[in-house]
Amino acid sequence: MSSRRNFIKKSLILGAGMAVAPGITFGSSNKKSQKLKIGMIGVGLRGSNHLRNLILRNDVEITAICDIDPNRNKLALKALDEAGRKKPKVYSNGEYDYRNLLDRKDVDAVIISTPWLWHTRMTKDAMLAGKYAGVEVSAANTIEECWDLVNTHENTGTHMMILENVNYRRDVLAVLNMVKQNVFGEMTHFRCGYQHDLRFVKLNDGKTAYGKGAEFGAKGISESAWRTNHSLLRNADVYPTHGVGPIAAMIDINRGNRFSSITSHATKAVGLHKYIEKVGGHDHPNAKLKFKQGDVITSTIETTNGETIIVTHDVNSPRPYSLGFRVQGSNGLWEKDGDRIYIEGESKPHQWDESNKWLEKYDHPLWQKYGEMATGAGHGGMDFFVLNAFVESAKQNIAPPMDAYDAAAWSAITPLSELSIENNGEPQDFPDFTRGNWVKRKPYNWIKNDY
């Protein structure tokens, strides 16, 4: 709860002027005259954070913004003006005005930060328009949408990147470095997920984004206006990529390995109902609703190379934040909860090491190079790195670290978990979104210091 509130406080700087640390500007790989022209589709709280970080770069220009909420556009314009940036073209004339933004010749790339149901169609439209697309998580809601992303990328040759920031968390990248250097031995098992009390996010009073009230949908504001309906209507892991994205990078999913099958189970749904009764009373209309999403959803994924991944979705109950990472191989393991590592032959037998000394030893080159300047970018610095990877990839018009095949495979967990739960935990096969090419695709080089 505190991490989200701290993020909101930083994002709201946009409404009161931009606090820019002196001397911090980013952008290096292309000539300064070759600025990447970016259109922002969605400048709510998440999109505004991306905008705040883009303003700090000297290699990009914001040429257009689009949001159906005129107030969000005004805040974005104010931030750009106070930073001495040119005024972009504004699009706010209905839900499909973003397509007019995509028609602009002075837009090379777009960043999509909108409600989930718009992610695939906007990303698809962007690729069809020849715009390099960055989309927030998750990228798709159905298997058909997953294929839409892959097919559109292949048919147009235009790239897209799923903007999964946790792949760039400092401890996650250090552990990735350990995996690639074979510290854990041959990898066998992983645990991850999204465990975060979002009751105060999914329900509010229609005036305050977080922390008050029992409304959602038409009577809600911010995320409660759209996110909570997924909990009402879908019994699925609707937000898997924060956990699965980093694990996929560690075991080269879609690049020599792939997800093969998934089984999922859900508990009963009580958390949101009890929260509504607590803050809105037993007679509140929303207290009469039956939410479909189980409070805790647990999925087990098998890979073609023989690893298993347990993924947990737990957002409707009182609990501290945790992504629940566990990374295990034949020589040892790391567990984030407890901040502990055990490496056979290095650790004392049957005793955990504190993780800090290992994470410092294997600190990732990216964090060694950019860590100090990335700290204020949002979410502990992760947002700087994921945005930097997007910008640098788009400037060169090359495949990003997390591409259309990754977006499809990771996002497919949602509909496949839903099907498995509906069928009493029956295993569901993952489509091969690479059409067999995962066998010969080379692993992405994550151990470098540029992006």
Where are these regions (language model features)?
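N-terminal glycine-/serine-/threonine-rich beta1-alpha1-beta2 phosphate-ribose binding loop
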Residues: M1-V135, W147, N151-H159, D450
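Active-site beta-strand termini and strand-to-loop segments that position acidic
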Residues: S299-N305, G329
